[in-house]
């Protein structure tokens, strides 16, 4: 199975100067190479903090390109991410941090730290390794975390790509919250074909 990080690496080589993401008002465009460089710096900063396989790092910031770069940086470090909304109550964020054993929350302050780091290569991951954790709403008590593997992400992206984005030139609008599970498909499917 061609895991997402392998597809990403190929696409950065093939389509480095192409736009990977455009903000909602069309004023900010980020290429595959730019997104890859920022995520590589984030990966370096994470590795310096001892982050790697088996870790889950929650990301909490406004919906923008840097959120995606943070997720990619976490994946490159070998860890899994949990996307959190900045609108979550502090108690919910604290519970999720404790539940997933996260050493810290990746936020805007962390991005500032990572901005001067050198680029790091992605760690090798297997299909069984964790890629991202999604937390339930917690409507019946505390939120419950569900860890999804790299194989699960790759299979979902492949299915959605074949159906919704069969051509490289296709684009996709993404408007759901980054903390919503369907968002993983909305983000990673368009990035996989280039």
Locate each region found by the language model.
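Conserved AMP-binding/adenylation subdomain of ANL enzymes
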Residues: 144-173, 177-194
């Amino acid at each position: 199975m061609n895991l997402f990080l392998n597809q990403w690496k190929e696409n950065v080589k093939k389509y480095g100067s192409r736009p990977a993401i455009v903000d909602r008002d069309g004023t900010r465009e980020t290429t595959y190479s730019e997104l890859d460089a920022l995520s590589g710096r984030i990966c370096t900063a994470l590795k310096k903090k001892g982050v790697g396989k088996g870790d889950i790092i929650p990301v909490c910031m406004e919906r923008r390109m840097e959120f995606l770069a943070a997720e990619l940086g976490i994946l490159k470090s070998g860890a899994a991410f949990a996307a959190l909304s900045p609108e979550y109550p502090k108690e919910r964020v604290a519970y999720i941090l404790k539940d997933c054993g996260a050493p810290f929350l990746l936020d805007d302050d962390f991005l500032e730290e990572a901005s001067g780091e050198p680029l790091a290569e992605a760690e090798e991951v297997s299909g069984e390794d964790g890629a991202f954790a999604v937390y339930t709403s917690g409507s019946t008590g505390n939120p419950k975390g569900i860890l999804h593997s790299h194989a699960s992400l790759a299979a979902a992206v492949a299915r959605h790509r074949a159906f919704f984005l069969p051509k490289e030139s296709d684009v996709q609008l993404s408007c759901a919250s980054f903390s919503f599970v369907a968002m993983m498909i909305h983000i990673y499917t368009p990035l996989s074909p280039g």
